[in-house]
């Protein structure tokens, strides 16, 4: 007479190692971002003089790497170790942290839609504040140059915003050779030229507006960004929805694994 053995609850290996594998990648990406951020700060001498963090008048792009890298590192660590060691505390922390990020993203999206005019004004102030600090930090300078080249724009709402910078303003007291000019990233590109002419923006704003349009981009970066957003709204919305679904999926998997672990422990 053969007896039937009762098979108790088990932890799903598929869910466990899927969460582990996904978060290992996330963890290493976080370490890479943090490493890039710390390396950039070391190159600037920030690590040897922490007080210099507050010296920059504009936005330091290195903060993006440090913040994003820090969040990815914490999430990756909690998800990876929590799944591998079947640690319910870390898995619950992973779920809650991911849920908070999802809630903040959702809130930011709603607020951006409701207060879009206010967001537009803040973006204008943000860009102009960084225009003032254009020469203060090489990373900020590269970010502004990339933005203006990519969007084919100049300043927040136009080339005259560069009057805010001490090197490019048109005042009589400005002895800079760049006086009444714009950075090279504002210049229209000639496909026949392989070498970038870094002096192409000199004296550009002293010319009549009709002549300016031939030499430099006259549209501001805020209107150009709005236009790009309208033209690519479906793609942008799809990306955000995809990220949101991945976050929900991650929360559900982590909670499912927690339930399996607690069920197994309860059967002991």
From Swiss-Prot:
<feature type="disulfide bond">
    <location>
        <begin position="154"/>
        <end position="186"/>
    </location>
</feature>
<comment type="subunit">
    <text>Interacts with ADAM10; the interaction influences ADAM10 substrate specificity, endocytosis and turnover.</text>
</comment>
<feature type="topological domain" description="Extracellular">
    <location>
        <begin position="114"/>
        <end position="232"/>
    </location>
</feature>
<keyword id="KW-0472">Membrane</keyword>
<feature type="glycosylation site" description="N-linked (GlcNAc...) asparagine">
    <location>
        <position position="232"/>
    </location>
</feature>
<keyword id="KW-0812">Transmembrane</keyword>
<keyword id="KW-1015">Disulfide bond</keyword>
<feature type="disulfide bond">
    <location>
        <begin position="187"/>
        <end position="200"/>
    </location>
</feature>
<feature type="topological domain" description="Cytoplasmic">
    <location>
        <begin position="83"/>
        <end position="92"/>
    </location>
</feature>
<keyword id="KW-1133">Transmembrane helix</keyword>
<comment type="similarity">
    <text>Belongs to the tetraspanin (TM4SF) family.</text>
</comment>
<feature type="topological domain" description="Cytoplasmic">
    <location>
        <begin position="1"/>
        <end position="17"/>
    </location>
</feature>
<feature type="disulfide bond">
    <location>
        <begin position="170"/>
        <end position="180"/>
    </location>
</feature>
<feature type="glycosylation site" description="N-linked (GlcNAc...) asparagine">
    <location>
        <position position="49"/>
    </location>
</feature>
<dbReference type="Pfam" id="PF00335">
    <property type="entry name" value="Tetraspanin"/>
</dbReference>
<dbReference type="InterPro" id="IPR018503">
    <property type="entry name" value="Tetraspanin_CS"/>
</dbReference>
<dbReference type="GO" id="GO:0005886">
    <property type="term" value="C:plasma membrane"/>
</dbReference>
<feature type="topological domain" description="Extracellular">
    <location>
        <begin position="39"/>
        <end position="61"/>
    </location>
</feature>
<dbReference type="InterPro" id="IPR008952">
    <property type="entry name" value="Tetraspanin_EC2_sf"/>
</dbReference>
<feature type="glycosylation site" description="N-linked (GlcNAc...) asparagine">
    <location>
        <position position="169"/>
    </location>
</feature>
<dbReference type="GO" id="GO:0051043">
    <property type="term" value="P:regulation of membrane protein ectodomain proteolysis"/>
</dbReference>
<feature type="transmembrane region" description="Helical">
    <location>
        <begin position="233"/>
        <end position="253"/>
    </location>
</feature>
<feature type="glycosylation site" description="N-linked (GlcNAc...) asparagine">
    <location>
        <position position="174"/>
    </location>
</feature>
<dbReference type="InterPro" id="IPR018499">
    <property type="entry name" value="Tetraspanin/Peripherin"/>
</dbReference>
<feature type="transmembrane region" description="Helical">
    <location>
        <begin position="18"/>
        <end position="38"/>
    </location>
</feature>
<feature type="topological domain" description="Cytoplasmic">
    <location>
        <begin position="254"/>
        <end position="268"/>
    </location>
</feature>
<comment type="function">
    <text>Part of TspanC8 subgroup, composed of 6 members that interact with the transmembrane metalloprotease ADAM10. This interaction is required for ADAM10 exit from the endoplasmic reticulum and for enzymatic maturation and trafficking to the cell surface as well as substrate specificity. Different TspanC8/ADAM10 complexes have distinct substrates. Promotes ADAM10-mediated cleavage of CD44. Seems to regulate VE-cadherin expression in endothelial cells probably through interaction with ADAM10, promoting leukocyte transmigration.</text>
</comment>
<dbReference type="InterPro" id="IPR000301">
    <property type="entry name" value="Tetraspanin_animals"/>
</dbReference>
<keyword id="KW-1003">Cell membrane</keyword>
<feature type="transmembrane region" description="Helical">
    <location>
        <begin position="62"/>
        <end position="82"/>
    </location>
</feature>
<feature type="transmembrane region" description="Helical">
    <location>
        <begin position="93"/>
        <end position="113"/>
    </location>
</feature>
<keyword id="KW-0325">Glycoprotein</keyword>
<protein>
    <recommendedName>
        <fullName>Tetraspanin-5</fullName>
    </recommendedName>
</protein>
<feature type="disulfide bond">
    <location>
        <begin position="153"/>
        <end position="221"/>
    </location>
</feature>
């Amino acid at each position: 007479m053969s007896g039937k053995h009762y098979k108790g609850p088990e932890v799903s290996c598929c869910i466990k190692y899927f969460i582990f594998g996904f978060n290992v990648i996330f963890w290493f990406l976080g370490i890479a971002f943090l490493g890039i951020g710390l390396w950039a700060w070391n190159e600037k001498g920030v690590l040897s003089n922490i007080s210099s963090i507050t010296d920059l008048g504009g936005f330091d792009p290195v903060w993006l790497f440090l913040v994003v890298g820090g969040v990815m590192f914490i999430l990756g660590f909690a998800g990876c170790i929590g799944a591998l060691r079947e640690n319910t505390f870390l898995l619950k922390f992973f779920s809650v942290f991911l849920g908070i990020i999802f809630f903040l993203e959702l809130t930011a999206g709603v607020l951006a839609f409701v207060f879009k005019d206010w967001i537009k004004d803040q973006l204008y102030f943000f860009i102009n504040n960084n225009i003032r600090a254009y020469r203060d930090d090489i990373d900020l300078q590269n970010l502004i140059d990339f933005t203006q080249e990519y969007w084919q724009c100049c300043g927040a709402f136009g080339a005259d915003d560069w009057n805010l910078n001490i090197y490019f303003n048109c005042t009589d007291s400005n002895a800079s050779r760049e006086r009444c000019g714009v950075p090279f990233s504002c210049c229209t590109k000639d496909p026949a030229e392989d070498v970038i002419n870094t002096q192409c923006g000199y004296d550009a704003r002293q010319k009549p507006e009709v002549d300016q349009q031939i030499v430099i981009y006259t549209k501001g970066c805020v209107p150009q960004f709005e236009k790009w957003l309208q033209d690519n709204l479906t793609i942008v919305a799809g990306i955000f929805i995809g990220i949101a679904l991945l976050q929900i999926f991650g929360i559900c998997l982590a909670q499912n694994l927690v339930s399996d672990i607690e069920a197994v422990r309860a059967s002991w």
